C-alpha cells in the first residue's frame, strides 16, 4: 500500500500542493489530471523525493518514505522509477548505455563511476528494448532518436530498475497521437504484466479514461475528484478544469491523443476560425 498523508508543498507564499491524502493499493494504474499549475508534477516529485514536502508524510509498505536518508533514500528512488516529459536521457551516449544506467542504484560506487556493466545487465537491457520495440536503436546515440523513441528508451531504463512503482510525469505531452498510444500501451503492459503500480500525470481526459482504472483530479493544489473513469461526470470535469472565458465547459476532444478525436478537434477549430472570419 502506498499512502500520502496530508502532504503539502509551499514555494514561498505559493501553495503548490494542499493537504493531499491518498491511499493507492499495489498494482493500480492511476491517472492524475488537472490544468497546468494544479500541483500534479510537484506531487509526483515529492513521492520520488526529488522535492521535500513542507508538511505531511509519504508512506510505502509501512515505511515512511519522506523520512528516508542516505542509502535508504537511494533504495527508494531505485524502487520508485520516474519517467519525465523531457526523457532525461544522455544524448551523446548510445541507447543501450542509457538503458543500463537504470541499474546504477543496484551497483557498487566504483562500477557505477567506471560505467562497467555486466553481460547479464546488457542482456537485460536489450530485452527491455525488445519489449518496447526499439531494439534496432541500441547502438544509436540517444539524441538522434525521435521523441516517441526517446520516451520508450526512458521506459526501458525504468524497467532496468526493477521498480515496485513507476511515476510518469506527463509522459505523452510532447508526443504525436500515434507515439502517445505506444507509450501508454507500454505503461499499461508494465502495470498488467508485472503488477507494478503506475501513477501518471496526464493532460488528456480520454487517455486517463482509456488507460487508468482510477482517476485523481487536482485543482489549485487540492484533490477535487478521486474515483473510477465512469464516475468522471461533466460536473466533475468542470470542477477540475473550470470553464473557458465564455463560461463553456471543456471540450475533451480538444485535448485528446486519439487520431480521430484530433481530427474532430481540428474540424471544430477550423469551423471557429471560419466563423470568426465571416463575422469580420
Swiss-Prot record:
GO CC field: plasma membrane
Location(s) in or outside the cell: Cell inner membrane
Coiled coil: none
InterPro entries tied to this protein: AAA+_ATPase (IPR003593), ABC_transporter-like_ATP-bd (IPR003439), ABC_transporter-like_CS (IPR017871), ABC_transpr_PhnC (IPR012693), MetN_ABC_transporter-like (IPR050086), P-loop_NTPase (IPR027417)
Biased composition annotated in UniProt, kind: Basic and acidic residues: 260-269
Gene Ontology terms, MF aspect: ABC-type phosphonate transporter activity; ATP binding; ATP hydrolysis activity
The ABC transporter domain, residue ranges: 2-245
Classification via CDD domains: ABC_PhnC_transporter (cd03256)
Enzyme Commission code(s) on record: 7.3.2.2
Residues that, per the record, bind ATP: 34-41
Region (Disordered): 257-280
Cleaved signal peptide residues: none
Claim: rRNA-binding is one of the keywords in the record: no
UniProt function note: Part of the ABC transporter complex PhnCDE involved in phosphonates import. Responsible for energy coupling to the transport system.
Family: Belongs to the ABC transporter superfamily. Phosphonates importer (TC 3.A.1.9.1) family.
Subunit structure: The complex is composed of two ATP-binding proteins (PhnC), two transmembrane proteins (PhnE) and a solute-binding protein (PhnD).
Protein name: Phosphonates import ATP-binding protein PhnC
Organism the protein comes from: Rhizobium johnstonii (strain DSM 114642 / LMG 32736 / 3841) (Rhizobium leguminosarum bv. viciae)
Gene name linked to the record: phnC
Amino acid at each position: 500500500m502506498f499512502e500520502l498523508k496530508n502532504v503539502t508543498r509551499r514555494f514561498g507564499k505559493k501553495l503548490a500542493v494542499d493537504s493531499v491524502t491518498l491511499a493507492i493499493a499495489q498494482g493500480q494504474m492511476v491517472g492524475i489530471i488537472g490544468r497546468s499549475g494544479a500541483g500534479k508534477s510537484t506531487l509526483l516529485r515529492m513521492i520520488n523525493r526529488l522535492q521535500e514536502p513542507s508538511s505531511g508524510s509519504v508512506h510505502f509498505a509501512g515505511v515512511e518514505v519522506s523520512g528516508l536518508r542516505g542509502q535508504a533514500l537511494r533504495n527508494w528512488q531505485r524502487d520508485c522509477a520516474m519517467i519525465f516529459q523531457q526523457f532525461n536521457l544522455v544524448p551523446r551516449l548510445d541507447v543501450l548505455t542509457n538503458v543500463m544506467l537504470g541499474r546504477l542504484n543496484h551497483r557498487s560506487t566504483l562500477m557505477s563511476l567506471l560505467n562497467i556493466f555486466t553481460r547479464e545487465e546488457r542482456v537485460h537491457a536489450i530485452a527491455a528494448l525488445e519489449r518496447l520495440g526499439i531494439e534496432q536503436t541500441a547502438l544509436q546515440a540517444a539524441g538522434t532518436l525521435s521523441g516517441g523513441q526517446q520516451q520508450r528508451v526512458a521506459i526501458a531504463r525504468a524497467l532496468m530498475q526493477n521498480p515496485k512503482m513507476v511515476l510518469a510525469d506527463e509522459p505523452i505531452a510532447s508526443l504525436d497521437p500515434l507515439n502517445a498510444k505506444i507509450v501508454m500501451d507500454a505503461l499499461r503492459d508494465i502495470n498488467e504484466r508485472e503488477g507494478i503500480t503506475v501513477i501518471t500525470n496526464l493532460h488528456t481526459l480520454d487517455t486517463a479514461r482509456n488507460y487508468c482504472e482510477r482517476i485523481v483530479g487536482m485543482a489549485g493544489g487540492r484533490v477535487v475528484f478521486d474515483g473510477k473513469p465512469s464516475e468522471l461526470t461533466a460536473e466533475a470535469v468542470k470542477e477540475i478544469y473550470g470553464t473557458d472565458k465564455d463560461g463553456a465547459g471543456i471540450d475533451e476532444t480538444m485535448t485528446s491523443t486519439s487520431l480521430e478525436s484530433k481530427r474532430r478537434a481540428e474540424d471544430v477549430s477550423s469551423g471557429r476560425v471560419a466563423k470568426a472570419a465571416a463575422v469580420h
